[in-house]
A protein has these predicted regions:
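Short active-site oxyanion
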Residues: 35-39, 80-81, 117-122
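Conserved glycosyltransferase catalytic-site signature
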Residues: 5, 106-110
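Acidic catalytic patch
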Residues: 14, 40-46, 73-100
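Acidic, PIN/NYN-like endoribonuclease modules and their adjacent C-terminal/linker elements
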Residues: 88, 113-147
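Short, flexible helix/strand-to-coil boundary loops that buttress conserved ligand/catalytic motifs
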Residues: 12, 53, 134-137
């Protein structure tokens, strides 16, 4: 499994409306990773998490950078958690962009979907847009407790 940025943000911030759902999923995924299940952090997701969590445009009280980095560090230090090495996913990203006629704000999701396909992983997100990029075998959409 690999979490999308919205899952990490919700899990990390107690004031997030989807905190409980995300935190419960994350805790379960970390237990599973310690028992041998896949849990992969994507570099683009980590960078987006740091950018969004620390932004005063996103949160009235942004997460201090040392706290945000500490959250990621704690995940990386957890048993069974890995950080992906990327690069060869370009051909899949290219194909998704051309076949699905993607551009603009679709590109970060397309890059994450391409990396998910390349690595043979499974993505978890609150974002419904991944349905058009990944099949059921590669994607789980978490439901919000507030939705």
């Amino acid at each position: 499994m690999k979490p999308d940025v919205n899952v990490l943000l919700a899990a990390a911030r107690g004031d997030h409306p989807q905190h409980e759902v995300a935190r419960t999923w994350l805790e379960g995924a970390l237990v599973a990773a310690a028992s041998g299940a896949s849990f992969t952090l994507m570099p683009m997701v980590v960078a987006s998490f740091l950018r969004l969590a620390t932004s005063p445009r996103i949160f009235q009280v942004p997460t201090p950078i040392d706290v945000a980095v500490g959250f990621i560090d704690s995940l990386v230090a957890s048993a069974g958690v890995t950080m992906a090495t990327l690069g060869p996913e370009w051909l899949l990203l290219r194909r998704l962009c051309v076949d699905k006629r993607l551009g603009g704000n679709d590109l970060p999701d397309a890059w994450l979907a391409a990396a998910t396909l390349h690595l043979g992983e499974h993505l978890v997100s609150f974002d419904r847009n991944f349905v058009k990029l990944l099949g059921r075998a590669q994607f789980t959409r978490l439901s919000s407790a507030t939705a």
